[in-house]
Amino acid sequence: ATLHNQDEIDRKDIRINDFVLIERSGDVIPKITQVLKNKRPQNTQKFSISDYKWPDPDCKIERIEGEAAYRCINPNCKSRVMGILEHFCSKNAMNIEGMGPQIVKQLFEADLLNSFDDIYKIKYEDLINLDRFKNKSAMNLIDSINQSKKTTFPRFLFGLGIPNVGQHISKIMDKYCNSSLEKLTELTVEEMVEIDGIGEIVAIAVKDYFNDNNNKNIVERCLQLGIEII
């Protein structure tokens, strides 16, 4: 079951070592419906997401204002970077078959992968000497990377991992911008909030993302390395 909302944890008084009832309806992610307090052990402990000890000592998580979510605020956090890369490669984003979490981690640790554009610099020779890779698997991954170069505006925008920009928002932006990243980057926050379905939080997140020179440079390098939005 998913349980990432501190307010919900507090409201239901869910503690470590508790017994709970879990309900699933259709394809919806299972949810905790009840704590069995009559079975509560003496060793239960209250849980706070903010107390989580991140593997990287330089990392710290903070709750995003106005949201239930907590995020690591260290831009160089290894777990965060790998998570962003995994998202970019995922089925609903760039759909790079074979580039799952384990391969992303392996390439990251081999210093072959640190940002999106690095994916399109990977060569067969980089892979063949790594564990898990044989001739066929290396060739298959290179083929998958090359096939992903032809993509759509919604897939690419969603893949960037901009906060609050999911698949639906990406499609709205695609329609308004006529599949033009250049037009998207030129929009002001005021112009974006006038788009039906786009709120201020999303508009600010998009503007902040493309105002960051590092982000802009990575996107530009991806395009230079052959990504074609069709």
Stretches with model-predicted labels:
Residues 1-7:
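Short, structured beta-strand/loop micro-motifs enriched in basic residues and often containing a Trp
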Residues 15, 27-230:
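Accessory alpha-helical DNA-binding modules that contact the DNA backbone or grooves
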